Every structure is written in structure tokens, then in C-alpha cells.
A protein has these predicted regions:
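Phosphate-binding site of ATP-dependent enzymes
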Residues: 21-97, 117-125
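A short, flexible beta-alpha/helix-coil linker loop
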Residues: 2-4, 78-82, 132-135
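A short catalytic or substrate-binding loop motif that flags glycine-/basic-rich loops and adjacent residues
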Residues: 1-2, 52-56, 107-110
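Short, charged/polar, Gly/Pro-enriched secondary-structure boundary elements
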Residues: 17-18, 134
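ATP-dependent carboxylate activation and anion-phosphoryl transfer catalytic cores
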Residues: 91-182
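Short, solvent-exposed loop/turn segments at secondary-structure boundaries
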Residues: 9-11, 86-87, 138-141
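Conserved anion/nucleotide-ligand pocket segment
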Residues: 1-11
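A short beta-strand motif that forms part of the nucleic acid-binding face
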Residues: 12, 75-77, 130-131
């Protein structure tokens, strides 16, 4: 997970260069290689170093209306980073309560997206907070929650009313269609 635009790498003990170059996925680096790289630099950009996280990976989208939030959670089953091919959409009260706290603490008054994954103790850990909804939120329109449209309504100062807390274990599959061209 997390390669490409997110710039996330897993540091591990890899015995030599051949083992590193032949290892997959390619977002795994040896600790020695990374340490030597850092020591060789005079100036480098800020880094965030955190524990290794594991599936399930969650991407939750939130609309904020005054003191209330509307959050749906997407759990990735197949895919990587923002390219989730198959997943499950749920209303999760605990995650929604967490997003309510985030909205209050970080003064998030419109829309946002959080990414969560599981640490080695089995607890969900926040590893990304985006002050916007992601493009993937558009798939929820078929479940009655059209995030892009509702975001525009909020922007215009209109109230929104949603029935979404009954959305449980709704599986989606996407990007698997054929397009023919001459």
C-alpha cells in the first residue's frame, strides 16, 4: 500500500542489494540503505516515520454540517492506495464519532477524508487526513449519498438531510468494464 503519490515506504532488514532489488513490492527499502541515504544528505525534506500498518485499510469520507457529520467508511478488499477495485462500504458509528472529534479539534467545517489502517496491536491508526473528499466518494451516490452534489449544497449554505446509517456491508467492484475503440 501507499506507494506512488503518498511516498510511503516500509523499512525492513534486507541482507543485500540483490535481495532488495528482487523484493516485491518495490516500496520496501532496507533500513541500512535508508540510514546511509539520510546520513549522506546535508538537507532533506521533512519525513514522517511511523509504525508499519496492516489491512484492513479504511478510507472514510465526511461531510460536516454545523456540529453534525455524515461519514461512510470504505474498506479496501482489493487494490492499492487510491485504486481500490473491490471494497465494502459501511456506516460505522465509532468511525463517525472519531470524525466528529477530528472536525471539532482541527476546525474542519466542510468535507474531509481520513485514511486508517491497523497496527500490530489490532487498533485502527489514522495515517492520513485530507481536507477534501476523494474522487472515490463518488461511488456512494448509488447508495443514496452523493458526496460531490451534497458538498455543493453545503457550499451554497443549504441544509442536507441524509438517510445513511442503514448502509452496512455494501460491496462494490469498479474499473472492470470493457471499452472498445477502432
Amino acid at each position: 500500500f501507499g506507494r506512488g503519490g503518498r511516498g510511503v515506504y516500509i523499512l525492513t532488514d534486507i541482507p543485500d542489494l540483490d535481495a532488495m532489488l528482487s523484493s516485491k513490492p518495490s516500496h520496501v527499502l532496507s533500513q541500512k540503505y535508508f540510514r546511509d541515504l539520510l546520513y549522506a544528505q546535508d538537507i532533506f525534506e521533512d519525513l514522517i516515520v511511523m509504525e508499519e500498518l496492516h489491512p484492513p485499510y479504511h478510507s472514510s469520507y465526511t461531510l460536516v454540517q454545523k456540529e453534525e457529520v455524515c461519514t461512510l467508511d470504505h474498506i479496501r478488499e482489493w487494490g492499492s492506495a487510491s485504486q481500490t477495485f473491490r471494497g465494502v462500504v459501511n456506516y460505522d458509528k465509532d468511525i463517525e464519532n472519531f470524525t466528529k472529534i477530528l472536525a471539532r479539534e482541527y476546525n474542519l467545517e466542510y468535507t474531509f477524508n481520513i485514511e486508517l489502517a491497523t497496527n500490530s496491536q489490532g487498533k485502527l491508526v489514522l495515517f492520513d487526513l485530507n481536507p477534501r473528499i476523494g474522487a472515490s466518494s463518488g461511488i456512494d451516490k448509488d447508495l443514496g449519498v452523493n458526496y460531490p452534489y451534497l458538498s455543493l449544497k453545503l457550499l451554497l449554505g443549504e441544509n442536507i438531510e441524509l438517510i445513511y446509517k442503514n448502509i452496512l456491508n455494501r460491496r462494490f467492484v469498479r474499473y472492470l468494464d470493457y471499452v472498445w475503440s477502432d
